[in-house]
Amino acid sequence: MPLLMLKDLPRYECLLEGSKQFPDLDPSACEVYLHLLRTGDEVFRVCDAHLAAHNISQGRFTVLMLLLDKATEGPHARTPAELAEMAGVTRATMTGLIDTLERDGFVRREPDPYDRRMMSVNLTPAGQAFLSKFLPEHFRRTAMLMAHLSESERKTLVRLLAKVLQGTTGVPSMASDGGASPVPSTPVFVE
């Protein structure tokens, strides 16, 4: 979900001035943090608008991509529980995503070929056709987003973002009961 961000981010000098009043304010860390949030928000907005133009959400697109990956791996069944784990969402959330995709004709639930007590989720021909039509444009748009970065800069960015992500595991967030709880190490995108 997009964040509410300032149109113009504060200049470094303003952050430096703020650190005089708030000694825990690290101006360079705050500057990087704000730029990271702003960039992520804008990339999410652009991607979300493109998906919405094709009547699909981030969450449903994620499920379709996980099932497409399944198709390239061979006859491994994907249960709703496996999909939930892979997407980093709850089973209840995954059930809702699958229900919508099934209603739209993109997936179907079938008895698992290895364990008849379980159900597996599979792409339908309509789901495969949607991805075949949608993905080339999606990948072109992704390339356009990253076109301003050289190959070396892209590798550096991936390495730096991985380091930032590692740092999130040690930062507590406030739980609804007021206590600290760990920040999830995997971002979750849902409808």
Can you describe what each PLM-predicted range is?
Residues 80, 98-99:
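Short, hydrophobic-biased segments on the C-terminal half of alpha helices
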Residues 27, 37, 45-89, 172-178:
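N-terminal helix-turn-helix DNA-binding core of bacterial DNA-binding proteins
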Residues 1-54:
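N-terminal leader segment of winged-helix/HTH proteins
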Residues 1-24, 152-191:
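C-terminal regulatory/oligomerization modules of transcriptional regulators
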Residues 31, 35, 62-66, 129, ...:
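Pre-recognition alpha-helix immediately N-terminal to the DNA-recognition helix
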Residues 99-159:
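Charged, amphipathic alpha-helical coiled-coil/dimerization segments
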